[in-house]
Amino acid sequence: MDALSKSMKVSRRSFLKAAGLATLSMMLPLEWASGTRRAAAEATDPMRHVINRLTWGARPDDLEKIRELGIEGYIEWQLHPEQIPDPAIDQLFQAEPVLQASYHQAKRIEQDNWQLSYKLMWTRLYRAAHSQRQLYERVVEFWTDHFNVPISDSAVEKLLDDREVIRKHALGRFRELLFASAQSPAMLYYLNNDSSSKEHPNENYAREVMELHTLGVDGGYTEQ
């Protein structure tokens, strides 16, 4: 291993260690107040109320930003995440290139499914604590829950589903998000479409897309 490789490895390890500790320190004060104290604070401070609803917790910088822009200005700013600089996440991408890798690149970089699974879970926590695109991260979490795909089946497919389906369409049209999810290898594998055929169709995805993703259990349709 040459000196540059060693330097990069140490830098990466140092970054991950520091980032992990920083993430924990950031997450601990997010629930600093009891429900009663928080409700009282929000009642007297509408800006804090908005921050607590749109973000993962009122950080000092968030409160400064909403006071600078005003409530409407802050919401408008958060609705355009592509225009918000996010240096903490840029550093994360530099430390973990697998997060932006293609399918085949990711397979080469991370051959241990559980190791990549851990990284994806840790990354979600890190983004929640450090990203400036807080509303975007909240919406990503909502759609991730709605179009649920377990991380344990295949972490690489989950990585691509998160990036190319959920994050790409999080603030876009639901129709486009639904179609992207319907073509996601992670979703198709999870709901057994990899074993579905014309002669022996598997109805798992069809049932889930009707009951959970769109119309609901009593949505005015039958299984006939």
Mark where each language-model region is:
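Primarily short, surface-exposed interaction patches in extracytoplasmic proteins
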Residues: 61-66, 119-224
